[in-house]
Every structure is written in structure tokens, then in C-alpha cells.
Design a protein with these regions (language model features):
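Short acidic-hydrophobic, aromatic-tinged amphipathic segments that line or gate anion-handling sites
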Residues: 2-11, 141-148, 200-214
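Phosphate/pyrophosphate-binding active-site segments
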Residues: 176-272
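Thiamine diphosphate
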Residues: 1, 272-287
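Conformationally flexible catalytic loops at phosphate/diphosphate-handling active centers
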Residues: 22, 31-95
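Structural motif
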Residues: 99-101, 159, 263
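Glycine-rich, anion-gripping cofactor-binding loops and their flanking helix/strand elements
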Residues: 103-184, 282-287
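Glycine-rich phosphate/diphosphate-binding loops that line cofactor/substrate pockets in enzymes
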Residues: 28-35, 87-100, 118, 254-260
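Conserved thiamine diphosphate
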Residues: 1-37, 227
Length: 287
């Protein structure tokens, strides 16, 4: 193809974050690295163009969120080398001793296998999307993440590892948007799957292959409040909607009517959010 990547940037204005611009340009350059060719970048500068002092540009408030990165000789997205077999990250022995959060987005049933037990062994918090097929350790996250005290403690995690993409829960998306620590993405594609444009380490791999290459370290949970809140939510939801006949009640009890070896198709966007917030699906159930 000619060019191998095209980037049509909007007219420059401060509303567009610097990290968005960097990750967008790096994504195009990464495609060029995989397939030699031309990258076309279109920048519609508004006229007239004024002279500017380089010192003023370097100290502009727009660049403040990325000043630390600008002083370091590394890419915004650290793409791990493509290998036939997933290799363990060189610093995994250190990172697995830290406080971590696992977020599981849309995954195939094959890739969903093992994430629950891996996170449980690590003592890390597991946040799951209804599309993940992963049985949550702390269900009803879209509800209990409304607790600002617990959310702030969760944001103190040292590392977040994201499997898959496309999260339905608004509160999980808000958590991801606010997190500022080490961020890893495991997704078997070259597509950009992080709408928040974190500086990150990116693994182009299937989730279960990545888990096999990164053995867990058995340790106690570093944060107990999410488990306590999820148990409270289970009781509260049952009390509020358990005996009623409405959409919320169906969403909460939908796992009771699922056929064995079936596939769940949710076509209404509001009902999808209710199911994501109010129910627990069996491990690996396709949706």
C-alpha cells in the first residue's frame, strides 16, 4: 500500500492532548517499521503563521504532562518484539512483586482462560468486562467503583495490565483514564486499543500465551476493600431487584436462563450496561 499509514491531524488547538498526538504518530511509525514505506501526515495549520521562541515552546503548559517523557530516550509505546513464543518481560521478576490491577476487556473464550486464577494467585485486583468471559474476583465493579475512597486506593497501584479492549463500564473506563502508573497492554493485534493514550508497554500476543510466559508470584491481596464491597453489592442488588420483574432483575438473573453451550447476544446498549453492572456470567461463556 502507498502510503503504509496516513495521519490526518485536526487543526492544532490545546483541546487535543499531547499524549494523544504522540501515540497517534507513533502508531503510524510502528506500521512503517513493520512494512517499509511512506507515512503521510497532514497538518492543517491555520494562517497566518507566527514566529515563536523555542524556549517558549519547550515551557508551554500544553507540554507539561509529557515533560518527563521528553527527557527520556524511549518510545511512548514500548512494543515488545514479535516472537513465535511470548518471552517474559525483562523486569517481570520485579513488577510481579508490586501492587497490580488486571483489567479484562473483550476476549475470546480461549484467551479468557486462566486470567482469574492467575490474578488470584498474584493477590491483584481483577476488573472484568462482561465481554471478557473471565469470572470476576470482585464482581459489580461498575457499582463499587463509585466509592471514591476505594477508587483512590486502587489508583495507587504500581501497575495495570490490560487484556483485550472495549470496556463497557463507565467507571472502569474512568479508572483507566485517571491511572498514571506503569501500564501494560496485552492484545493480539497492531491496533491502538488504549483510548487514554498511556505511555505503555505493548505485547502483541494472546492473553493465555502471555500468562504462560509470566509466572505469577503467590502473595496476599494488597487491597481488601474491593472484595468486601463486591460482597455487599451482591446482597444489596438482590434485595433491590431480586423479586421484581423488570430489566434490572433480568440482567441480574440472566445467568440462570443461559443454555449449556449457548452464546449470549445482547443487542440493546442500555441492557448491555445493566448486565455488565449487575450480573456474573459463568467462566468462558461466549458473548
Amino acid at each position: 500500500d502507498y502510503p503504509v499509514a496516513s495521519v490526518n491531524l485536526p487543526k492544532p488547538q490545546a483541546d487535543y492532548a499531547a499524549k494523544w498526538l504522540i501515540s497517534t504518530l507513533e502508531q503510524a511509525c510502528y506500521k512503517q517499521k513493520q512494512q517499509a514505506g511512506v507515512v503521510h501526515i497532514n497538518v492543517p495549520f491555520a494562517e497566518p503563521l507566527y514566529n515563536a521562541q523555542e524556549q517558549e515552546i519547550d515551557g508551554h503548559p500544553w507540554l507539561m504532562p509529557i515533560q518527563r517523557w521528553l527527557s527520556q530516550p524511549k518510545n511512548w509505546v514500548d512494543h515488545q518484539p514479535l516472537q513465535q513464543e511470548v518471552l517474559m518481560h525483562e523486569n517481570w521478576d520485579t513488577w510481579r512483586t508490586k501492587r497490580g490491577v488486571i483489567v479484562a476487556g473483550q476476549l475470546t473464550p480461549e484467551q479468557a482462560m486462566g486470567i482469574n486464577s492467575w490474578a488470584n494467585t498474584m493477590g491483584w485486583i481483577l476488573l472484568t468486562d462482561i465481554q471478557s468471559g473471565v469470572e470476576p474476583l470482585t464482581p459489580y465493579a461498575d457499582i463499587w467503583l463509585a466509592n471514591q475512597t476505594v477508587k483512590q486506593k486502587l489508583l495507587q497501584a504500581d501497575i495495570v495490565i490490560q487484556f483485550g479492549s472495549r470496556f463497557i463500564s463507565k467507571r472502569i473506563n474512568q479508572f483507566l483514564a485517571e491511572f498514571q502508573g506503569e501500564f501494560w497492554v496485552v492484545e493480539q493485534s497492531q491496533n491502538a486499543v488504549d483510548p487514554n493514550h498511556h505511555t505503555q508497554t505493548r505485547f502483541n500476543a494472546k492473553a493465555h500465551h502471555w500468562l504462560r510466559a509470566h509466572p505469577p508470584l503467590r502473595q496476599k491481596p494488597w487491597l481488601l476493600e474491593p472484595l468486601a464491597l463486591s460482597k455487599f453489592c451482591a446482597t444489596f442488588i438482590e434485595q433491590q431487584v431480586g423479586g421484581n420483574l423488570n430489566e434490572a432483575s433480568l440482567a441480574h438473573h440472566i445467568e440462570r436462563v443461559l443454555p449449556y453451550n449457548g452464546i449470549l447476544f445482547l443487542g440493546n446498549s442500555l441492557f448491555v450496561r445493566l448486565v455488565d453492572a449487575l450480573t456474573k456470567l459463568p467462566e468462558g461463556y461466549p458473548i
